């Protein structure tokens, strides 16, 4: 072994290819290539183009620090993208692909532009950007002027990674490609995301979200008038959707009520009706992550078959669903966790961003005719050759009649004759999931001599509705026992040291870490990231808990006060003895900084060794989108805490 995957290397040497889109003729793939700029302390991204015929790659953009969201025009002659090349603004640009030429700016906004979609005739592009009715002209704040007093009358007045919103909401706009003339199409009181054109260009189907994305419906926008019609119940959800070839139907994934599950539905425009197609979909269509990753939209193969990207048991797969027969077939799966989904007009080639235990930040191409999948980039091959990733194995644990999937990462130079410290990594959610992905936290720990075990206890996503619902009103119950059973199975192995066990998790994983150290003294060290520590205070301060908490915890605080207390780590923190590091972003609106502050005080007064690392400006998603220096600092603290306390 010649090198380690240190925090610095994982942050500053990793190059990530993302958001790949294949040209309509299937001959080229455009993607955004990103990396961390140490001096500027920010991520940068430029557009690159891969030629399938010759295998050559070339850089397309050079101006600006972040060029993203590349989207092909229907005829393949242009690529639209979003750029920060105009200081203080977000610009929508188009770049010619078949002849040399400069990118041309179509329009700009002070707020971020996103969710581009070309009209079928290639003359117009739909997009979204935030609109503040109190600042319709998007005027910058005056220098030296005191911040305005913030007054709100709505519950969803803030959102993680966006901050204070009040009445600011994302709206749908269109811009004429030839003239650059733009038009604000919607003025809705709620956010509209990811508009998709109907085949005849008369409608845009978008996701309209309420309560910061907890509930969502389809919004049908009449392009001529801007009139918006909402489809489905207010308390339902929509994750992905796609127009049928005739423009008469829309397939969508989601649910008609808050159940923690996802099914497939078919909406008919002519009858304005919804038909349920499945009752417990065994896989989870890739709906992205709010404000961070877009959904992987399905594609109709013909009048009845739909191809989509979904996750099953932590593994990416391509699935074909027949809307007439309700037959579901997995066409392809690999031991990876991919992001995005782009297909050519012939429906042969699928391009995705790729991550696995052995690679990260690459673009993968799947040939539906041959069944072959291959990486077309090798951005991080030299890094992983010098600093090999962890070895791994998958195993299962049976507990109380339920099978729990689990994985174990081992140092690349693993020696079965040695004894290693063990760290249990708990995912977020609670309906998140672990899977076949390259995880910087896990890989950094394994590279520094730790066994890392992680699992999908009951409540995890990607196993269907019933499995996900097992955690409702039972946080810290059966899910905790599942995790302890998985850890027990690993600690029975001769190379795992039961006297050197640690636990770490972020978000719901932070909840479980805080919960565990109040239930047992088996852990000799803990790292608790962005915890949910006290359910009652979380309910009134989180951007989503006032609605989401009712489903998860059994009601409002006054309706379920005993349950809130029984499932709060704060109730048991006085019993904790585990040395604990708490890490949290100070601008976290999902699990607010007050949760970490309460935990710090409770552990300090319990006599624990405790340290609190706070990241100014850090949102809940800071480990993904935060400044490189903060992400590197976090990884150093994670590895350092366990090294100091587990040896």
Regions found by a protein language model. Name each.
Residues 19-21, 126-128, 135, 149-152, ...:
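Non-catalytic accessory segments flanking enzyme active sites
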Residues 24-25, 74-75, 120-121, 199-200, ...:
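Residue-level detector of Asp-centered blade-edge/turn motifs that repeat once per structural unit
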Residues 33-46, 61-67, 80-93, 102, ...:
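A flexible loop/linker signature enriched in serine peptidases of the S9 family
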Residues 183, 275-294, 379-390:
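Surface-exposed loop and turn segments in beta-propeller and other repeat-based domains
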Residues 377-499, 504-506, 538-547:
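Cap/lid segment of the alpha/beta-hydrolase catalytic domain
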């Amino acid at each position: 072994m010649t090198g380690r995957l240190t925090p610095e290397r994982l942050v500053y040497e990793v190059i990530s290819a993302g958001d790949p889109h294949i040209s309509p003729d299937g001959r080229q793939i455009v993607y955004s290539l990103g990396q961390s700029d140490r001096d500027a302390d920010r991520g940068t991204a430029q557009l690159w183009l891969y030629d399938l015929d010759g295998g050559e790659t070339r850089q397309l953009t050079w101006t600006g620090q972040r060029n993203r969201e590349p989207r092909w025009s229907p005829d393949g002659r242009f690529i639209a993208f979003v750029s920060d090349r105009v200081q203080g603004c977000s610009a929508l640009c188009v770049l010619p692909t078949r002849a040399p030429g400069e990118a041309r700016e179509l329009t700009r906004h002070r707020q971020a532009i996103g969710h581009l979609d070309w009209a079928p005739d290639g003359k117009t592009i739909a997009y979204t950007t935030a609109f503040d009715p109190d600042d319709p002209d998007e005027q910058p704040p005056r220098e030296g002027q005191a911040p305005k007093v913030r007054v709100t009358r709505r519950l969803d007045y803030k959102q993680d990674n966006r901050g204070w919103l009040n009445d600011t909401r994302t709206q749908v706009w269109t811009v004429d490609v030839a003239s650059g003339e733009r038009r604000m199409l919607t003025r809705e009181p709620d956010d509209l995301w990811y508009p998709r054109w109907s085949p005849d260009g008369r409608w845009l189907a978008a996701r309209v979200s309420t309560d910061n994305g907890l509930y969502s419906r389809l919004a049908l926008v009449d392009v001529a008038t801007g009139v918006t019609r909402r489809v489905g119940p207010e308390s339902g959800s929509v994750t992905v959707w796609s127009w049928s070839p005739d423009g008469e139907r829309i397939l969508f994934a989601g649910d008609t009520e808050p159940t923690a599950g996802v099914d497939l539905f078919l909406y008919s425009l002519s009858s304005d009706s919804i038909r349920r197609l499945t009752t417990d979909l065994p896989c989870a269509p890739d709906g992205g992550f709010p404000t961070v990753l877009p959904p992987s939209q399905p594609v109709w193969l013909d009048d009845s078959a739909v191809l989509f990207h979904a996750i099953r048991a932590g593994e990416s797969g391509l699935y074909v669903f027949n809307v007439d027969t309700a037959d579901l077939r997995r066409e392809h799966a690999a031991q990876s966790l991919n992001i995005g989904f782009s297909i050519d007009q012939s429906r042969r080639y699928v391009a995705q961003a790729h991550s696995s235990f052995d690679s990260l930040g690459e673009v993968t191409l799947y040939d539906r005719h041959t069944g072959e999948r291959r990486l077309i980039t090798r951005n991080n091959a030299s890094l992983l050759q010098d600093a090999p990733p962890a070895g791994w194995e998958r195993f299962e644990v049976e507990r109380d009649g339920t099978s729990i999937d689990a994985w174990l990462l081992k140092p690349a130079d693993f020696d079965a004759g040695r004894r290693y410290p063990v760290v249990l990594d708990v995912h977020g959610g609670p309906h998140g999931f672990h899977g076949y992905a390259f995880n910087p936290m896990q890989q950094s720990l394994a590279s520094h001599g730790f066994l890392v075990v992680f699992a999908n206890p009951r409540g995890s996503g990607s196993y269907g509705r019933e499995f996900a619902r097992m955690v409702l009103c039972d946080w810290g119950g059966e899910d905790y026992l599942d995790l302890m059973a998985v850890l027990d199975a690993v600690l029975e192995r001769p190379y795992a040291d039961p006297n050197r066990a640690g636990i770490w998790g972020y978000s719901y994983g932070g909840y479980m870490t805080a919960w565990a150290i109040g239930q047992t003294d088996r852990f000799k060290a803990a790292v608790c990231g962005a915890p949910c520590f006290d359910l009652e205070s979380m309910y009134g301060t989180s951007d989503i808990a006032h609605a989401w908490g009712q489903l998860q915890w059994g009601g409002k605080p006054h309706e379920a006060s005993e349950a809130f207390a029984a499932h709060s780590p704060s109730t048991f923190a006085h019993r904790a003895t585990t040395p604990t590091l708490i890490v949290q972003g100070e601008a976290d609106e999902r699990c607010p900084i007050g949760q970490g502050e309460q935990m710090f005080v409770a552990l300090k007064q319990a006599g624990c060794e405790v340290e609190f690392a706070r990241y100014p400006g850090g949102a809940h998603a800071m480990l993904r989108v935060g400044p490189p220096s903060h992400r590197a600092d976090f990884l150093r603290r994670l590895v350092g805490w366990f090294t100091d306390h587990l040896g």
